[in-house]
Amino acid sequence: MLKNQLAKGNNGLVRTKYITFGIKAENIREAKPKLERIEADILNNFKVLGVSAYPLSGEERLQILYETFNPEEKVPFQFSYDRVLRSGMGTKDFIAPTSFVFRDGKTFQMGNTIGAASYLQILAPELTDKMLAEFLDMDRNLIVNLHIQSLDQMKAIKLVKSKVTDINRMKIEEQKKAVRSGYDMDIIPSDLNTYGGEAKRLLEDLQSRNERMFLVTVLFLNTAKTKQELDNAVFQTGGIAQKYNCSLRRLDYMQEQGLMSSVPLGLNLIPIKRALTTLSLIHISEPTRQ
């Protein structure tokens, strides 16, 4: 039976998907009713899509953190809030590994597990569900995170307008250089024409087609027992990224921030973001039953 499962590509790895959302508020009393409304909307949208979803309890969230920080640990997660009250320990004491080591800037160690945090340099015009499916089909320990922050519509339009102005200014400078050098002023670098056209189309989409703009960060957390296994996993992950016109880049000297941004706390400590529109993002949200 095990041989049959391995032949089918199912070696016991489990795929789970979480959505974490957050808002800015002065205190938890102000935030709680807003979060509850957002939660109800999200669950209702999943129901419409035919996807089963449920909110996690505090203990379930702690178990996810425990399994993330202790991927090779054989001892199951043991926790109760009564034990916290009786022992005087905090919740961190129940989920932390024996050690964290961030030494060389490109990898880190959690107990006996070695890991590497990377980000996706998005060169393609859109993200597709096929790319995400290939990452999730990898026969490796892998955490994929998509941090998506919506921009206020007026701020997004203002941002794109400033980019259009910058490109037009660069065009004028290039035309002046061409005139001084005796060249045709209509001959300017092709990149400027390309970027200028894309920026104008984006502005039109935001103003007249009800598109929204989002700042997106895609992170990958590979973990393994040995350095060689980790290198193989990172190489395989990078190969899939290249297939879809993207590039996997290591978070040099930001491994700790990459790790903490890869757990489902809704916290993004990585300042590397790519602006994408609704149409560019919608393809990665195909509903699946898992």
Regions inferred by a protein language model and the residue ranges of each:
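Extended, folded cores of ATP/NTP-driven motor/assembly subunits in large transport
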Residues: 1-281
